[in-house]
């Protein structure tokens, strides 16, 4: 039954909710509420009073704390943990791996990628618009 709820939430989110207007717009047709409802079934862990904005994309193993939001057009990789009271501007990207840069004698494009690593954003953080976050 839980798997069916998850599948239904993914379908509703990707086919309808993601396209509804931003939550702060005057006539948003309940887009923010519908996206939050779907996110509760889709995220690994989901706090209270969350906000998911239009066209936000996130992996399955993402955690979102109380009173936090995912901004417009955000892209959040699997394994990301977002704490409480986090504000995120538009067009943010959180990645879970990077290019290897170990050997300066070899071009980066030939060194491949680092291993996948989780990213943790602590409590009470403001992530400005168009920020890209890489794992350490």
Locations of regions flagged by a protein language model:
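Terminal amphipathic alpha-helical/low-complexity segments used for targeting or macromolecular assembly
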Residues: 1-42, 100-104, 117, 124
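Glycine-centered flexibility motif
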Residues: 20-21, 47, 65, 83
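Flexible, glycine/small-residue-enriched loop-and-beta-strand segment within the central core
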Residues: 29, 35-36, 57-64, 69-136
């Amino acid at each position: 039954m839980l798997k069916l709820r998850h599948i239904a939430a993914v379908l509703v989110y990707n086919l309808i909710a993601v396209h509804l207007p931003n939550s702060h717009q005057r006539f948003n047709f309940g887009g923010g509420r519908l996206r939050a409802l779907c996110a509760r079934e889709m995220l690994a862990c989901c706090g209270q009073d969350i906000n998911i904005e239009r066209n936000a994309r996130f992996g399955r193993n993402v955690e979102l704390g109380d009173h936090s939001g995912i901004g417009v057009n955000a892209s959040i990789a699997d394994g990301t943990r977002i704490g409480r009271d986090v504000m995120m501007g538009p067009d943010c990207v959180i990645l879970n791996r990077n290019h290897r840069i170990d050997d300066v004698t070899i071009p980066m494009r030939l060194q491949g990628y680092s291993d996948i690593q989780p990213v943790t954003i602590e409590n009470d953080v403001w992530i400005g618009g168009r920020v890209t976050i890489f794992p350490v």
